[in-house]
Amino acid sequence: MLDPKFLRNELEATAESLATRGFILDVERLSKLEEKRKSLQVATEELQASRNAISKSIGQAKAKGEDVAPIMAQVGDLGSQLDSKKAELAELLEELNAIALSVPNLPDASAPIGKDESENVEVRRWGTIKEYGFEVKDHVELGETLGGLDFKSAVKITGSRFIIMKGQIARMHRALAQFMLDLHTTEHGYTETYVPLLVNEDSLMGTGQLPKFGEDLFHTKPATEEGQGLSLIPTAEVPLTNIARDTIIDEAELPVKLTAHTPCFRSEAGSYGRDTRGLIRQHQFDKVELVQLVKPEDSMAALDALTGHAEKVLEKLGLPYRTVILCTGDMGFGSSKTFDIEVWLPAQNTYREISSCSNMQDFQARRMQARYKAADAKKPALLHTLNGSGLAVGRTLVAVLENYQNEDGSITVPEVLRPYMGGLEKIG
């Protein structure tokens, strides 16, 4: 969430910045609520001071042998007024907090202003797009012909947007995840982490999925008097980042760099009719996630580095890609700046997103109270959090199947994956 003090003191500037994201901040409502908050705060403090002053006079009256009943009655009346004002203030603060939780992050000044994905800006391309001397097949046809992708059985067992993988294609899917983890842990300095696949509401609130995006989640257990509800993770970003929730990290331990390979679960609310064929948009998919916790002054350099770590996966696999910086109107709710990496898919004759790398600055950290303390600092300060896919495993499999297909329908195994597949050079 945004800094409440900044929001109050820079209301017009905040509204102007948020408008570039297509978010309309109700300035008039917030201004009225803020005036009411100030008034209630002053009234509460004055009542408290009056009650304290009169309470002190009780002892003096007793010492003089005076009747203290009228004073006691006055104290009681002030106490009732104070309780009423406190309750009113608490209700107002709850309303202000709910508004604050619904407001997206401010875009960084370096993010291009634009209304939607058509105004994203390409920053670089890598690799050469292969010319095929035959009609290319998409990953669905390739996978089904090889007996490695079974959509029909998945629909029968569960429903649409699920997959069963078998044989060497399932093995390649596993190999891709292992390769990614090995690359990030041995060359990029991340610590491999095993995390829960179920998270509570505090965790989802901390990373920004709640309260705004509850419909995108698979909820497995409702909240009860005994405890919070649990939901399946939409991304390992949630448990990885929440490791720092309500924690103060020593400056010497920064940066913290974590990676995890997990299944991810998304309802894909609002995606009806989009990417209904194949593995591009699934309710359950695997992803290798990258998370960094850094000092504020290091976060933009960390974003460039993290994006490079995700790009390196594609480079080692020999898959052409392009990287774009998202415009303000296309950024995620909690992001201040995002790079999307898009891999080339021959069957679609276009680039498709395979990774989104974002700097959240202190947006998540403020929600989570994730802080660090410098050796010479009197107080701890908020961390900056970053995350990105390194990569989405299913979409990477799609890219390998399509880019490495041969005319006879077989798939050449990329060299970097062969050690993970027992030296296998070709599928089919």
UniProtKB/Swiss-Prot annotation:
Q: Name one GO molecular function term.
A: ATP binding
Question: Entry's Gene3D superfamilies?
Answer: Bira Bifunctional Protein, Domain 2, Serine-tRNA synthetase, tRNA binding domain
Q: Where in or outside the cell?
A: Cytoplasm
| Major localization listed first in the record, in broad terms | cytoplasm
Q: What is its EC number?
A: 6.1.1.11
Pathway assigned in UniProt:
Aminoacyl-tRNA biosynthesis; selenocysteinyl-tRNA(Sec) biosynthesis; L-seryl-tRNA(Sec) from L-serine and tRNA(Sec): step 1/1
- Which residues of the sequence carry a binding annotation for L-serine? T235, A236, E237, E289, S389
Q: Enumerate the InterPro entries for this protein.
A: aa-tRNA-synt_IIb (IPR002314), aa-tRNA-synth_II (IPR006195), aa-tRNA-synth_II/BPL/LPL (IPR045864), Ser-tRNA-ligase_type_1 (IPR002317), Ser-tRNA-synth_1_N (IPR015866), SerRS_1_N_sf (IPR042103), SerRS_core (IPR033729), tRNA-bd_arm (IPR010978)
Report keywords, A-Z: Aminoacyl-tRNA synthetase, ATP-binding, Cytoplasm, Ligase, Nucleotide-binding, Protein biosynthesis
Top-level class of the enzyme under EC nomenclature: ligase
Superkingdom of this entry's organism? Bacteria
Catalytic activity reads: tRNA(Ser) + L-serine + ATP = L-seryl-tRNA(Ser) + AMP + diphosphate + H(+); tRNA(Sec) + L-serine + ATP = L-seryl-tRNA(Sec) + AMP + diphosphate + H(+)
Pfam entry (one)? Seryl_tRNA_N
- Which family does the UniProt entry place this protein in? Belongs to the class-II aminoacyl-tRNA synthetase family. Type-1 seryl-tRNA synthetase subfamily.
Q: Which HAMAP family match?
A: Ser_tRNA_synth_type1 (MF_00176)
Q: How does it assemble?
A: Homodimer. The tRNA molecule binds across the dimer.
Note what the entry says on domains.
Consists of two distinct domains, a catalytic core and a N-terminal extension that is involved in tRNA binding.
User: What's this protein's function?
Assistant: Catalyzes the attachment of serine to tRNA(Ser). Is also able to aminoacylate tRNA(Sec) with serine, to form the misacylated tRNA L-seryl-tRNA(Sec), which will be further converted into selenocysteinyl-tRNA(Sec).
Please give the name of this protein. Serine--tRNA ligase
Biological classification of the source: Bacteria, Pseudomonadati, Pseudomonadota, Gammaproteobacteria, Alteromonadales
